[in-house]
């Protein structure tokens, strides 16, 4: 591919029809994907001599080739553009980082249905409510329902194997259907009330509960009346918090806000007239820094990005864009949903719109302030380390285990804008003496920097090791063994009091020992990164330890692989319950023969 690009020659043969264009640099790297109603006019605008934003100028300076694809109309161009952006994620495009399916509340079938969080395909029989904008929003609803109507939320395998009520019953979060402490018709009524709440019929539910409460009081059933009174009080509290309610239907309210430091899109989800929650998105802003372009890119990626989201009939936005008609047509063509985009709204919808705008502005302001705060800490650390410029990349390692069991090493990465979580790594440590933190750290660093030397990953400017002189010396040995280019090695050890603010630091070699004042921004950054490495190591260790304890006793049984182990534990509700089962009971589990049941039983009772 040639490194020079002649815009005049290219535009002379460029079509004026709708389509998609792709810009490449001299190394054939895709830089940007765009769409246009008129390809020739749109592409010509890039090569005007004046009026470009800095990022557009940077893009144009790197163009070595442009490829175009003509489409039948703008809608086809939009769909193709989104497909290419999702596949290639070009650096100059606006990119939406969040790519997870959105959660629903799932109500299972059966005599004693269960409420739970669900993501992914809707295969299980039951009812789905949502989608909710975040897991936090859905947990709030489930917590309220658990307090108010005490519908169970435990796994079916756990429910089927209970012989006495669990802690949830003791704290009045469940009525104990697992051991027959509630009549089926009473439980069914609680489920019906939960459904009314999830459908957004809170007012009708409150009226019904009030009427039932009055009847109970008239019948002198004061205990039941008090229970209903508490339920009504909880519902009213939620209704007060959801003061934005007051309309019907399914609506997403989307507000975009842009300033020179970045962009934020705030989304509020309304289903059945009830606000389910909200979420902030911080898209990677490409060359389009106008708020309308950010909004257009967000809507296309969010609603057409390949995730099977349940689409609302209306989207309220705070800014309009010429691409919206093509977007609406694309939604109908691809998803079969007739969607309306509203901009000028009144009443309740206007309040939703304004709240979304306010939240977008505040979220971006807070994010940029935090980014500036972290950057100032990096500058302070640079002074401590004697660097002319702040380091751009810090890595920190920590080890977690329980008396040598399930040892896990963590690696967290920070930059001037904060944690770079996509670069976090965990290492399951094998083949070292139980409890030998030095050997565990040696293995983790060797594995990590061997990969970096092989071209997998980036070398940090500063390597932060949570430990004293011993860990520092070991880390230096690893770097020397692998001939890793010079980088700054910084060790942090707790002081004699083991309190925050009294840490001892070691720079490059264990002989260079110093401390920092408790109010030092550089020390605060070191503490933040160390604590994050500690957290990441502990969560990994707990997950590994839990998995080991759940499955290790079955791993030696011939014919019991990972899938069968999982199904067995799910059928019996856990390893403890499986251990109590007889051979005949084990043989009744799906896919388990009498002979295999005997082997499983013998393995569980071998000691």
UniProtKB/Swiss-Prot annotation:
Keywords: Cytoplasm, DNA damage, DNA excision, DNA repair, Excision nuclease, SOS response. One of its GO terms (biological process) is SOS response. Its main location: cytoplasm. The keyword ATP-binding does not apply. Belongs to the UvrC family. Gene3D superfamilies: 5' to 3' exonuclease, C-terminal subdomain (1.10.150.20), GIY-YIG endonuclease (3.40.1440.10), UVR domain (4.10.860.10), UvrC, RNAse H endonuclease domain (3.30.420.340). One of its GO terms (cellular component) is cytoplasm. NCBIfam families: PRK00558.1-5, uvrC. PROSITE patterns: GIY_YIG, UVR, UVRC. Residues 16-94 form the GIY-YIG domain. Residues 203-238 form the UVR domain. The UvrABC repair system catalyzes the recognition and processing of DNA lesions. UvrC both incises the 5' and 3' sides of the lesion. The N-terminal half is responsible for the 3' incision and the C-terminal half is responsible for the 5' incision. It holds the Pfam family GIY-YIG. It is found in: Cytoplasm. GO terms for molecular function: DNA binding; excinuclease ABC activity. This is UvrABC system protein C. Interacts with UvrB in an incision complex.
């Amino acid at each position: 591919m040639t490194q020079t690009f002649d815009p005049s020659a290219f535009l002379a043969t460029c079509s004026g029809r709708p389509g998609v264009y792709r810009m490449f640099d001299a190394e054939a790297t895709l830089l940007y994907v765009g769409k246009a109603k008129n390809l020739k006019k749109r592409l010509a605008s890039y090569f005007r001599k004046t009026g470009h934003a800095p990022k557009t100028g940077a893009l144009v300076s790197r163009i070595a080739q442009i490829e175009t694809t003509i489409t039948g109309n703008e809608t086809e161009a939009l769909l193709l553009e989104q497909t290419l952006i999702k596949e290639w994620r070009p650096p100059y495009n606006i990119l939406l980082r969040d790519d997870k399916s959105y959660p629903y509340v799932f109500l299972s079938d059966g005599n004693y249905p269960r409420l739970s969080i669900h993501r992914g395909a809707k295969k299980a029989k039951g009812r789905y409510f949502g989608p909710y904008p975040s897991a936090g929003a859905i947990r709030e609803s489930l917590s309220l329902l658990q307090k108010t109507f005490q519908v169970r939320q435990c796994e079916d395998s756990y429910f089927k194997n209970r012989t006495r009520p669990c802690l949830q019953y003791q704290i009045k979060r469940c009525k104990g259907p697992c051991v027959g402490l509630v009549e089926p018709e009473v439980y069914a009524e609680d489920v019906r009330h939960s459904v009314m709440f999830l459908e957004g019929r809170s007012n009708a539910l409150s009226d019904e509960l009030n009427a039932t409460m009055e009847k109970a009081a008239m019948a002198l059933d004061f205990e039941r009346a008090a229970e209903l009174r508490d339920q009504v009080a909880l519902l009213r509290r939620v209704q007060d918090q959801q003061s934005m309610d007051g309309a019907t239907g399914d609506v997403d309210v989307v507000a975009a806000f842009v300033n020179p430091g970045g962009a934020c899109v705030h989304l509020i989800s309304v289903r059945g007239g009830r606000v389910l929650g909200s979420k902030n998105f911080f898209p990677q802003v490409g060359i389009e820094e106008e708020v309308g372009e950010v909004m257009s890119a967000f809507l296309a990626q969010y609603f057409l990005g390949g995730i099977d989201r349940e689409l609302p009939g209306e989207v309220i936005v705070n800014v309009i864009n010429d691409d919206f008609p093509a977007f609406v047509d694309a939604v109908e063509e691809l998803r079969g949903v007739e969607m309306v985009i509203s901009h000028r709204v009144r009443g309740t919808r206007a309040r939703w719109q304004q709240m979304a705008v306010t939240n977008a502005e505040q979220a971006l302001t807070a994010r940029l302030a935090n980014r500036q705060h972290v950057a100032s800490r990096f500058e302070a650390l640079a002074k401590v380390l004697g660097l002319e410029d702040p380091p751009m990349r810090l890595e920190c390692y920590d080890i977690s285990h329980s008396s040598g069991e399930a040892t896990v090493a963590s690696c967290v990465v920070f930059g001037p804008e904060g944690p770079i979580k996509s670069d976090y790594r965990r290492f399951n440590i094998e083949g070292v003496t139980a409890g030998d933190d030095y050997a565990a750290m040696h293995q983790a660093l060797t594995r990590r920097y061997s990969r970096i030397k092989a071209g997998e990953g980036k070398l940090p400017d500063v390597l932060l090791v949570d430990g004293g002189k011993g860990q520092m010396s070991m880390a230096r040995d690893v770097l020397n063994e692998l001939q890793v280019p010079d980088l700054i090695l910084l060790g942090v050890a707790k002081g004699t009091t083991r309190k925050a603010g009294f840490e001892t630091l070691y720079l490059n070699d264990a002989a260079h020992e110093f401390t920092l004042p408790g109010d030092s921004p550089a020390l605060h950054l070191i503490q933040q990164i160390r604590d994050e490495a500690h957290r990441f190591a502990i969560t990994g260790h707990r997950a590994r330890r839990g998995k080991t304890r759940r499955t290790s006793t079955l791993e030696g049984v011939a014919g019991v692989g990972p899938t069968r182990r999982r199904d067995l534990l799910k059928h019996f509700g856990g390893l403890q319950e499986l251990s109590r089962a007889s051979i005949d009971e084990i043989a009744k589990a799906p896919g388990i023969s009498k002979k295999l049941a005997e082997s499983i039983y013998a393995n569980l009772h071998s000691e």
